[in-house]
Amino acid sequence: MISLLTYTLKNLPNTSKWALRFCMRPLSSSSQLQAAAASQTKSKKTLAKPNIRNIVVVDGVRTPFLLSGTSYKDLMPHDLARAALSGLLHRTSVPKDVVDYIIFGTVIQEVKTSNVAREAALGAGFSDKTPAHTVTMACISSNQAMTTAVGLIASGQCDVVVAGGVELMSDIPIRHSRKMRKMMLDLNKAKTLAQRLSIISKFRLNFLSPELPAVSEFSTSETMGHSADRLAAAFAISREEQDEYALRSHSLAKKAQDEGLLSDVVPFKVPGRDTVTQDNGIRPSSLDQMAKLKPAFIKPYGTVTAANSSFLTDGASAVLIMAEEKALAMGYKPKAYLRDFMYVSQDPKDQLLLGPTYATPKVLEKAGLTMNDIDVFEFHEAFSGQILANLKAMDSDWFAQNYMGRKAKVGLPPLEKFNNWGGSLSLGHPFGATGCRLVMAAANRLRKEGGQYGLVAACAAGGQGHAMIVEAYPK
């Protein structure tokens, strides 16, 4: 098979809707892209299935997402997770003893609280009889937490589950070198002074060099940013196009923030600091300013920069998921149904960031829907180049036929329906918490805009991906 990264643009549809739409006008200046036009709820079939429980999102919250190294820098992950859980309890008034199970996603684990779901639950005042576990699946960890909750409820094991995610990039674990760790363990086992002196005599200064957390893929030894740069080149996505998309994300996020649309954000009183009330990474700039930045990964000719990449972020999120009959019995008005979902994986070398392209047609087929049925799209924005590459791949018959074994492309999401309240580029991306943010953004947008179906999709390290259909709850 021809390598994706050596396949040139001449083999992609030069006159695709995306090429025309994206290259002919600045994304930041189109009124269509500033917000979706309000529409009446369309009359479509529901995705309810006979003899299968309807599962709903009652509500969801998140702490403000902050640039790492700012107001959350002195906290631990369980502090943020506890804040999200406490915010959810306050928002929903759900009795703690009604919650059957708690699941949190995270990526970079703090050893002291390796099961951060359990520690955060206890810290938030949940019963010690409420089980909790932590999952990890890179950037789709909280997606996995939510779908695990769906499975527990669908199988009848639970009626009420809290799912969420957390990431604290301000204090990542930094270990001693392997040689130093081995020496310290050997010293701990030594029984005599002579044995200890013998071990110490082997010490060398380079043992003190710290072992930093890996930023590259274990299987390929390539950083995600480097992969994004190669992917952008493979799909002939220019630096200007990437900067335009990033500016769009920040502009829409700022607009949504100013209009009070980011209602899932709950204030958090940081111990010893002021109360944090909003995301602090939203930074509408200008294309001229963004163009001044140097490439961040492939130098000097790469196109991925700090401006068109998501930034290191601290934050936590949580959603209350219930069986519909339980929610109604408790007097709740749910926000949305969680419907079909799909996980995919592909080549982590050349297709690391193409999870949405692979997952989208599969979840649509599973749900019996088409792209035209979707009213709201919420895709994770790891990099501008990643988003634009996915959009081009989704709009390419050649890619569908040669890489996905499909007869035709799935099609291009209309930009007027796409990430209209900003995305990970602007709001931030705490690895373990983004999935819940995506679902709540879709649910809240459906309610605001009068749509019925939302599609959530994300890529993840390891060449994995996720997509889910969210259906608006009837008003």
Curated annotation (Swiss-Prot):
GO annotation terms (biological process): fatty acid beta-oxidation
Span of chain positions assigned to the transit peptide in the UniProt entry: 1-34
Site positions (Increases nucleophilicity of active site Cys): 429
N6-succinyllysine: modified positions: 73, 189, 191, 292, 294, 333
Compartmental location: Mitochondrion; Mitochondrion inner membrane; Mitochondrion outer membrane; Endoplasmic reticulum
UniProt pathway annotation: Lipid metabolism; fatty acid beta-oxidation
Domain of life: Eukaryota
Keyword Acetylation assigned: yes
Assigned EC number: 2.3.1.155, 2.3.1.16
Active-site positions on this chain: 139, 459
Enzymatic class: transferase
GO molecular function, one term: acetyl-CoA C-acetyltransferase activity
Record field: catalytic activity: an acyl-CoA + acetyl-CoA = a 3-oxoacyl-CoA + CoA; butanoyl-CoA + acetyl-CoA = 3-oxohexanoyl-CoA + CoA; hexanoyl-CoA + acetyl-CoA = 3-oxooctanoyl-CoA + CoA; octanoyl-CoA + acetyl-CoA = 3-oxodecanoyl-CoA + CoA
Intramembrane segments: 174-221
GO CC list: endoplasmic reticulum; mitochondrial fatty acid beta-oxidation multienzyme complex; mitochondrial inner membrane; mitochondrial outer membrane
Principal cellular location given in the protein's record: mitochondrion
Signal peptide residue numbers: none
Protein family membership: Belongs to the thiolase-like superfamily. Thiolase family.
Task performed by this protein: Mitochondrial trifunctional enzyme catalyzes the last three of the four reactions of the mitochondrial beta-oxidation pathway. The mitochondrial beta-oxidation pathway is the major energy-producing process in tissues and is performed through four consecutive reactions breaking down fatty acids into acetyl-CoA. Among the enzymes involved in this pathway, the trifunctional enzyme exhibits specificity for long-chain fatty acids.
UniProt cross-references to PANTHER family, sorted A to Z: ACETYL-COA C-ACYLTRANSFERASE, TRIFUNCTIONAL ENZYME SUBUNIT BETA, MITOCHONDRIAL
Summary of subunit composition and partner proteins: Heterotetramer of 2 alpha/HADHA and 2 beta/HADHB subunits; forms the mitochondrial trifunctional enzyme. Also purified as higher order heterooligomers including a 4 alpha/HADHA and 4 beta/HADHB heterooligomer which physiological significance remains unclear. The mitochondrial trifunctional enzyme interacts with MTLN. Interacts with RSAD2/viperin.
Protein name: Trifunctional enzyme subunit beta, mitochondrial
Gene: HADHB
